[in-house]
Amino acid sequence: MGTVIALTNSKGGVGKSTVAVHLAAWCHQCGRHTALVDADAQGASSAWLHEAEPDLAIARLQTPDEILDQVPRLATQYDVLVVDGPAGLSEVTRAVLLVANLALLPCGPSVLDLRAVQEAIRVVGQAQRIRGGPPQAVLVPNKLQVQYRLTQELLATVQTLGVPALGGLRLRQAFADAAGQGTLVWRLGLRGAAATEEITRLFAELNIHESEANHEPSATLS
């Protein structure tokens, strides 16, 4: 069984698709048999990844039944499934959490973003109680501007939420440029160098692997 990594939040505009596309491409380029599941009706991540990595498998699943039926089946065929969930805590999002091993929760540095991620953590907790364990929730602080008070408050608040956090991503033009050009930050040359270093370091923290003892998928923080 492959590792199912969900990108979810109760608010849009927090960087779900940016992380999903780059994570899927990074896993693929690291030699993992990878597919993207686009569960967002807007289809932004699937369109972006189709341009950036046309050889990488993509599935569009739009309903809770499709998620619950197809994701476990796909997980038997791939090492890693990256699921880009819809904005909001809909039944589709809840279905995604019922089949994911890991839930990445991007969060921007605003009061609304913090409220949204707290609600997302609550819903992840519901899925954990139903399943008796997974998915593990991990925060991804995003659009950081370290010199600003809101970013400093976000980073301080993250420590109080009871959920582990990755190193975070700064607000960088390279991420917007990659989306607009249908490419990846590591293909932007010098313009994308800082963003590339940051996002690949963030992914390396996940330690995505399969246990040799029982072949169970897992993703742990380093």
Language-model region placement:
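Inter-motif core of Ras-like GTPase G domains
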Residues: V92-V111
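Inter-lobe coupling/hinge region of RecA-like P-loop helicase motors
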Residues: D177-A195, I199-T200
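Conserved C-terminal guanine-recognition region of P-loop GTPase G domains, centered on the G4
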Residues: V117-G132, N142
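Beta-strand-loop-alpha "switch" segments that mediate conformational coupling across diverse proteins
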Residues: Q145, L155-V185
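P-loop/Walker-type NTP enzyme "switch/lid" segment
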Residues: V4-V14, A25-R94, A179-V185
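Conserved nucleotide-binding/hydrolysis micro-motifs of P-loop NTPases
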Residues: A41-G43, V111, L144-Q147, A174
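Structural beta-sheet core signal
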Residues: L36, V83, L105, L139-P141
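Hydrophobic positions on the alpha1 helix immediately C-terminal to the Walker A/P-loop
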Residues: V19
